[in-house]
């Protein structure tokens, strides 16, 4: 089977980039595979990319040429915004190739792509059918009226052009994503039957056996949607220690909190081995996202390393973290709830914490290994090709 993967890299690396790279490496072991990548630029080049994203003839030509040469059975699209634009879907479909779209955000539901605005959930775009004028008025994308409008217009234009209906299969990484796309209104009107769930995966490289310390750990992008403000406010008034690792727009706020509160420490941006080590010695990892997190690769990384989780109770964390099994939940964005759960966790005996750790590895092996993922992907591809 011949498979062509297409992805537009973000300016700041994120989870979607990792998903693309991991699945590319995974599929290399299962058939002939090629990839086409684009890069989102900043400045005037980025502005031109953004404007041309409604119908990017250059990207279309690049994809068309690869399909002529490679003759793939499947084209799988990851991120199309904004370097390639959705036109690549039309090109593949018109050349007779089965098209799969990997949905790792909510851009087809709302121009915010996160259903979050000013630190709060913004669901107007999925509660009302039609063009998302309220989202445009509120400037939910980069606080820009024009950019929000244009992104919404690109999605709406391709609805009118029939692009979204040309996709043979949409893959959602969690039931949360599938539910938001299939049970709520949207201005794309994608048929429900085209969605299925296939979780992302992590690569387990062996578990480090370390004596766990008493501090908590946060690893991830230092940004609004990850609940950084709420997390810092909780630990500013807590006696427990917190180590924060990552990078992002709220890094300065994290450094300021570290300077003022000795129980909060910043570890910087860690490589894979350092992440593994950090997860092996903390008492638990805190996943504090305040939005409908589509998946959360750091959760599967924690599970693979036997690191219990204390997670918010909406989005994919509500699915991936099983209460009382491999972690516990707190009410999203609620400082008192998080503090109560921190107290609960620290009052557990060591044997009980070890049970959680053992269950983490069991959960990972059951659901999130590369082998499971390869099996699921190939099953999807074969089903499409055979039909």
Regions found by a protein language model. Give the residues of each.
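A conserved mid-protein helix/loop that constitutes part of the nucleotide-sugar donor-binding site
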Residues: 17-18, 214-237, 249-252
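Donor nucleotide-sugar binding/catalytic pocket of nucleotide-sugar-dependent glycosyltransferases
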Residues: 131-206
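Nucleotide-activated donor-binding/catalytic signature segment of Leloir-type glycosyltransferases, i.e.
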Residues: 253-273
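Short alpha-helical donor nucleotide-sugar binding micro-motif in glycosyltransferases
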Residues: 269-270, 277-282
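Short alpha-helical segment that forms part of, or immediately flanks, the ligand-binding pocket
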Residues: 276, 299-304, 318-319, 325
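Short hydrophobic beta-strand element within catalytic cores of glycosyltransferases
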Residues: 308-311
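Conserved acidic donor-binding segment of nucleotide-sugar-dependent glycosyltransferases
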Residues: 323-324, 328-335, 344-350
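A charged, aromatic-enriched C-terminal amphipathic alpha-helix characteristic of glycosyltransferases
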Residues: 351-382
């Amino acid at each position: 089977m011949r498979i062509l993967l297409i992805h537009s890299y973000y300016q700041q690396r994120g989870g979607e980039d990792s998903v693309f790279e991991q699945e590319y490496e995974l599929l290399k072991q299962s058939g002939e595979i090629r990839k086409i990548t684009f890069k989102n630029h900043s400045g005037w080049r980025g502005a031109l990319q953004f404007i041309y994203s409604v119908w990017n003839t250059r990207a279309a030509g690049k994809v068309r040429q690869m399909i002529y040469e490679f003759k793939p059975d499947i084209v799988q699209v990851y991120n199309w915004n904004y370097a390639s634009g959705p036109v690549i879907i039309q090109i593949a479909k018109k050349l007779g190739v089965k098209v799969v779209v990997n949905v790792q955000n909510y851009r087809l539901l709302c121009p915010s792509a996160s259903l979050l605005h000013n630190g709060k959930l913004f669901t107007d775009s999925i509660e009302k059918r039609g063009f998302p004028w309220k989202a445009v008025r509120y400037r939910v994308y980069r606080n820009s009226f024009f950019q929000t409008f244009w992104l919404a217009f690109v999605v709406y234009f391709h609805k009118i052009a029939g692009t979204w209906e040309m996709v043979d299969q949409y893959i959602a990484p969690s039931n949360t994503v599938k539910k938001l796309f299939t049970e709520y209104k949207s201005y794309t009107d994608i048929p429900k039957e085209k969605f299925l769930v296939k979780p992302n995966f992590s690569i387990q490289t062996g578990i480090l056996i370390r004596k766990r310390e008493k501090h908590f750990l946060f690893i991830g992008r230092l940004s609004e949607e990850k609940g950084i403000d709420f997390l810092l406010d909780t630990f500013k008034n807590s006696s427990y220690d917190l180590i924060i690792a990552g990078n992002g727009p709220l890094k300065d706020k994290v450094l300021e909190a570290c300077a003022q509160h000795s129980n909060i420490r910043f570890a910087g941006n860690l490589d894979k081995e350092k992440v593994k080590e950090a997860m092996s010695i903390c008492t638990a990892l805190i996943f504090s996202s305040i939005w409908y997190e589509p998946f959360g690769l750091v959760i599967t990384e924690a599970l693979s390393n036997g690191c219990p989780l204390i997670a918010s109770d909406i989005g994919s964390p509500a699915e991936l973290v099983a209460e009382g099994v491999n972690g516990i939940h707190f009410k999203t964005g609620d400082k008192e709830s998080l503090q109560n759960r921190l107290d609960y966790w620290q009052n557990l005996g060591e044997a009980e914490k070890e049970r959680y750790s053992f269950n983490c590895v069991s959960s990972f092996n059951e659901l999130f290994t590369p082998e499971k993922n390869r099996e699921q992907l190939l099953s999807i591809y074969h089903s499409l090709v055979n039909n």
